[in-house]
């Protein structure tokens, strides 16, 4: 019964995220907002809602900070696997696609955030008041994210003008977008409690359970949305969704750090270090996918490396 609950909730996450990706594509075509901003900030934030609310539930209701690290870091590697997997099947179409320049900048910011999380674990430095203390690196992560959002908001280098008729008004699109977002939040909270029960039943560590069950399940929105966007030819928003979600996931650690008052959210464990190392490696490989866009063999090689990185990280974390 527990596994059935997990599957049903995961399926609901997929359905809701596919609908969200459709309305994001509608906004992309009906407004003057840059495609990089819509995919990398709006859609990224919405498809990261499961990571956000599952992590907050893990901290506030379940007292499981290890679930948060496994969820966020595991989700980040899985997200990049989506790009790797898509490239294996759509590399020829990808070579003809137009991408915003900000995507590579976002990945560089992401690598910097990995370094900040590593520093938070190895050299913990808390700032704040007696009743509210946060790791200094959490503040720096928020600042880095804010700078990246500014870059994305001004980047329209990947936008392509196309005449597409959409019958819905911007207002109706926005209302439906919000409704599906709320549904995604509710399902995400339920998914966290089921994952915690699965971890107990299978006697898995919280970090491993977070990386496998939460990391994969909460990445289903990114997977579904990105596959759907590539299917309709919007590679730019698809890439923005993945790399933007990865950056947004890092600030989830910051929120959890503020709310968890019984210790540090940044825990030094071998499983966490594995996820950090392979996550950073996957980001480097994704940069190769972007910079080597015209060289199909290089794109395919980097994509295989991303997929191999995820499998290896999970095996070493068991």
Predicted regions and their residues:
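Hydrophobic alpha-helical segments, chiefly the membrane-spanning helices
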Residues: 1-318
